[in-house]
């Protein structure tokens, strides 16, 4: 009997975290264009990170994280604006690599950790390939007219803020906005933004860049948007523009802006629940969500 009583004893209670409900005073008044992806990915993790300011613990890794890797690439690539007419691949590559070396020396000193050295070798290969693609672009009539252009534009009660990596103008007057991407695999803009079978937006970055440019330069005419991909497989380095014409005939640009308005309305209304399911190895908040049941509960007023 004693044994059965022991076996029937309840499991020890697990302490669970219940974050405070959204305080209207803490809701963001400004949103970066890239923040929309975070909300679409998981409203509740957006709330933890961008409203409550929670951050995952630093594991002390001695390597460059993806954001830092991208920053180094951006800093080097920004120097192309100083020589808009230059179309010599070797000279362009030398310029990019010299700027990278200067930044690395400042950030890591003369002896970077071995993991960083390996990453920098990959980045050098990507920048050399970028020089080739950029040279082709110049020969085709494109010129850089702006890099790292900051913006702040009103959008349905909030401010959209951010920086546009690069704006090009063609000899015939066409404009395009390019976002540098250093993900290992080359990215197709429409695939990274929209899932047609589900009619689901998973990112709004490029449509919002187009909207921002139209607001800031209403007389400039239509502007294309796309990625300048710098993938690990350097042979696939390329510029990829986003096509807003859906097979159904729908104008995906208008649909993207409508979804962006919905996101802003949800944030302003304090809608951050429920959390999305994510793989633990891709979740910076895995400690909170990885348990069964999760260690986190829906925010509610006391």
Label each residue range with its predicted role.
Residues 1-302:
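RecB-family 4Fe-4S metal-dependent nuclease core
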């Amino acid at each position: 009997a004693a044994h059965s009583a022991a076996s029937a004893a309840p499991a020890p209670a697990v302490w669970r975290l219940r974050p405070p409900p959204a305080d209207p005073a803490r809701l963001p008044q400004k949103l970066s264009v890239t923040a929309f992806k975070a909300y679409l990915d998981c409203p509740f993790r957006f709330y933890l990170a961008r409203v409550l300011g929670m951050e995952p613990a630093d594991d002390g890794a001695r390597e460059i994280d993806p954001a830092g890797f991208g920053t180094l690439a951006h800093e080097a690539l920004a120097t192309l604006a100083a020589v808009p007419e230059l179309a010599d691949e070797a000279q362009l590559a030398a310029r990019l690599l010299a700027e990278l070396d200067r930044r690395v020396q400042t950030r890591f000193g003369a002896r970077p950790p071995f993991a960083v050295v390996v990453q920098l070798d990959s980045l050098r290969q990507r920048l050399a390939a970028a020089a080739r693609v950029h040279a082709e672009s110049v020969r085709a009539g494109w010129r850089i007219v702006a890099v790292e252009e900051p913006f702040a534009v009103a959008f349905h009660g909030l401010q959209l803020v951010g920086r546009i990596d690069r704006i090009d103008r063609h000899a015939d007057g066409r404009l395009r906005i390019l976002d540098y991407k250093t993900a290992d695999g080359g990215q197709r803009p429409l695939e990274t933004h929209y899932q047609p079978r589900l009619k689901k937006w998973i990112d709004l970055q490029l449509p919002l860049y187009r909207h921002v440019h139209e607001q800031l330069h209403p007389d400039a005419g239509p502007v294309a948007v796309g990625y300048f991909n710098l993938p690990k497989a350097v042979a696939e380095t390329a510029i990829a523009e986003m096509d807003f014409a859906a097979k159904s005939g729908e104008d995906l640009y208008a649909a993207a802006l409508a979804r962006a308005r919905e996101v802003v309305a949800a944030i302003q209304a304090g809608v951050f629940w429920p959390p999305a399911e994510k793989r633990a190895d891709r979740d910076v908040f895995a400690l909170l969500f990885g348990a069964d049941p999760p260690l986190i509960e829906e925010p509610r007023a006391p």
